[in-house]
Each structure stands twice: as C-alpha cells, then as structure tokens.
Design a protein with these regions (language model features):
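Extracytoplasmic and endomembrane cell-envelope/extracellular-matrix remodeling and assembly machinery
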Residues: 1-39, 43-44, 83, 88-115, ...
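Short, surface-exposed glycine/acidic/tryptophan-bearing loops
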Residues: 7, 63-85
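Alpha-helical scaffolds flanking conserved acidic
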Residues: 47-54, 71, 119-124
Length: 225
C-alpha cells in the first residue's frame, strides 16, 4: 500500500531525500534493467513496484556480492538460488544473470505472497526467510497480538527493509512531493535476448551488437568466463 505512512517509512524516505547522489547512482545503474523487470512483473500480474526491490538489495548492481555469499541484483544465496533453478558453476552464475535471477525472484516472491497473504510479509520473508517470519507470526498469535508486518518482532534489518522498500516506491511514484529529482529512465527495452546457439567470443559479440565490450559485459553479468 503506497499510501501508507508511518514513522518507520518516513525515516527511510528522509534518508533517501537527503542522499540525492545515491539516488543518482542507483537510477543510472537501473536504467539498463528496469524496463525489463517492470515488464516481467506486469506480465505476471504482480505489483510493478516489486521491480524496485533490487534498489534495496543491491543498488541494482548485478555484480553485487555480500558477506553472506548472496550474489546478483536480487541477492540470492547459493541454496535459495538452487531451489529456484539458478545454475551456479565454473562457467555461469544464474544469480547474477538479469533474466534468470528476475524470474527466480518473482517466483520466490509470488510463492511467499501465497504463503503469507500480504506483500509486506512476503518482502519480510524474502529478507529474513519464511521460517523467521512464520515464527514471529505464531508468537504474536499465541500472545493474542496482531500478526501483520507492522506488529511483528523481526530482525532489525528486516524491520527497516520493508519500510525502506515502501519509501523508495513512494519516492519513485512522486519525487517532487518529497523534494528529490530522478534521472529519467526510457520507457523502452534497453536490451533484447539473443540465442547464440553456442559459445561466442565476447569481442565479436560486442562488434555484432554495436556496443562496447564493457556494455556487453554489464548486460551479461552471469558469465564467469
């Protein structure tokens, strides 16, 4: 619910509004991928705001790697990646691949929404794990307390994670209302998927595509070799 407002959301929104340079970096990086992630959400009939989750997870960096061994712009750990069909081998890491990781993330989020019945709880479970969220729900219910996200006791990171996501979604929807400016992102595909039918030299591929080698690398981050 993007109309929701409380102190926790406002605190995150204020942080973003005071860090314009961070927003500039994120929107510049997201420009390559956002049309694709939004389009995929639309095709699935899930909230398009979910395409903003990589802003929170990785600042939309498909090469991001965390201390917990999470990788890619959706930050899958190895085990969860395998559950959702992301190949991880010497040649390729599907957690970093834009197409594969987006499919897996939306599969995971849809599954979590089916389990918990709200997108706020689904996002919390994406961050903390479904087990942690379910235990917190059970604890509240046993104590006769509400079991919505805002009433749960969860790890501190998760307690700020959902408000941060909602704050970002509100800023993107109405930046002028909160005193921030955002780089425009073209409402058209930045890339298209091409099957090479086998291995191809990257320099040759870049030449055929009419892009720089660096740009081709940014669009194919899943390849280790």
């Amino acid at each position: 619910d993007l109309t929701l407002d409380n102190e926790r959301i406002a605190a995150q929104r204020n942080w973003y509004s005071q860090h314009q340079s961070h927003l500039d970096r994120v929107t510049l990086r997201a420009a390559r991928y956002l049309h694709y992630t939004v389009s995929e959400a639309e095709q699935r009939g899930i909230p398009t705001e979910l395409a903003l989750l990589p802003v929170i997870e990785s600042s939309y960096n498909p090469f991001a790697y965390s201390h917990a061994s999470a990788a890619g712009m959706w930050q899958f750990i190895p085990g969860t990646g395998k559950i959702f069909g992301l190949k991880q081998n010497w040649w390729f890491d599907g957690r970093r691949d834009v197409i594969e990781s987006t499919r897996a993330a939306y599969d995971f989020l849809t599954q979590l929404h089916s389990k918990f019945g709200s997108w706020e709880l689904a996002l919390a479970a994406y961050n903390a794990g479904p087990g942690a969220v379910q235990r917190s729900i059970n604890r509240n219910l046993a104590e006769g307390l509400p079991a919505d996200f805002w009433s749960l006791r969860l790890p501190s990171e998760t307690m700020s994670y959902v408000p941060r996501f909602l704050a970002m979604a509100q800023l993107i929807k109405s930046p002028e209302s909160f005193g921030v400016s955002l780089r425009p992102i073209m409402d058209q595909p930045y890339f298209r998927v091409v099957d090479t039918n086998g291995q191809i030299d990257l320099e040759s591929a870049a030449s055929l595509a009419g892009v720089s080698l660096k740009e081709l690398y940014q669009l194919n981050p899943g390849f280790n070799r």
